[in-house]
């Protein structure tokens, strides 16, 4: 939904660019180790979710996709390299934010300049950083009236919002049951 919203904001606004940000935390217990290549080649596997959504919404053969990519209007960056940046005229999608620390999220949101929107997406059930995630705390911090008045919105999906598949809806329901019984 965030990529869809970002692409909608980009359409008809040539001054805006899309920046995809995520962490290089792996979801498996055992990492692959160092990846060969330059920064772009190393980060490319982490861009798979963005590429999947772009393919779904803007197939390879569409002029829109080719134009956005060739003009450099879609780019990606790991959270590690944000310090010092200032974003104007950007639509930022921060994905897998449950794997960002509070400090990393602070770095992310303090890059906001003029005409910038940030979508911070995450699922606290899927954190891979063992209690170090700042995602839930950041959500709580900005889920108030003052933030809403400034245009900061918080939205949490639940099981009824799942569209991927019926089996996934069942799986999430069972995981939530298990989580409630443990707590």
Q: Where in the sequence are the language-model features?
A:
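Conserved helicase motor core of SF1/SF2 NTP-dependent helicases
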Residues: 1-94, 98-183
């Amino acid at each position: 939904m965030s990529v869809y919203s970002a692409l909608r904001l980009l359409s008809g606004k040539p001054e805006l660019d899309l920046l995809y940000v995520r962490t290089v935390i792996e979801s498996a217990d055992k990492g692959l180790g160092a990846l060969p290549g330059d920064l772009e080649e190393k980060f490319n596997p982490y861009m798979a979710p963005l590429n999947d959504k772009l393919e779904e919404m803007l197939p390879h053969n569409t002029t829109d996709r080719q134009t956005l990519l060739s003009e450099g209007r879609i780019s990606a960056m790991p959270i590690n390299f944000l310090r010092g940046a200032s974003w104007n005229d950007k639509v930022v999608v921060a994905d897998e934010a449950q794997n960002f620390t509070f400090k990393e999220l602070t770095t992310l949101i303090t890059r906001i300049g003029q005409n910038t929107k940030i979508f911070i997406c995450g699922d606290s059930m899927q954190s891979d950083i063992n209690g170090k995630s700042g995602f839930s705390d950041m959500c709580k911090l900005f889920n108030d009236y003052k933030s809403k008045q400034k245009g900061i919105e918080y939205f949490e999906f639940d099981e009824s919002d799942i569209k991927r598949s019926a089996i996934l809806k069942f799986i999430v329901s069972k995981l939530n049951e298990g989580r409630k019984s443990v707590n």
